[in-house]
């Protein structure tokens, strides 16, 4: 499974309905399985981004479908990063080192 980190920004519509934010997030967590995705973390944040969503997916296509679902109501926008754990990073960097 691949890990993804999505940085969440509320839209103007999302800000208007901010009192529903926790309920929306709960619904998203419950619906994730329909897309082959497991949500492993949800955080509301201060600063440039309003929240962080961390999830695992077996394929990029599953992650993309899930994110389209998350943003489809127009409440939030996302900026998503593919994340690597230390074992994966080690493997990637060893390949780089062996190329030289």
Regions found by a protein language model. Give the residues of each.
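Short, well-ordered beta-strand segments in beta-rich or mixed alpha/beta enzyme
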Residues: 4-9, 43-66
């Amino acid at each position: 499974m691949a890990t993804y980190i999505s940085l969440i920004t509320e839209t103007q519509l999302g800000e208007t309905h901010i009192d529903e934010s926790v309920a929306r997030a709960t619904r998203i967590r419950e619906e994730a399985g329909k897309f082959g995705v497991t949500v492993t973390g949800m955080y509301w944040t201060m600063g440039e981004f309003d929240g962080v969503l961390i999830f695992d997916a077996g394929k990029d296509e599953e992650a993309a479908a899930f994110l389209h679902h998350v943003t489809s109501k127009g409440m939030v926008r996302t900026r998503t990063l593919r994340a690597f754990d230390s074992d994966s990073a080690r493997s990637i960097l060893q390949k780089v080192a062996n190329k030289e």
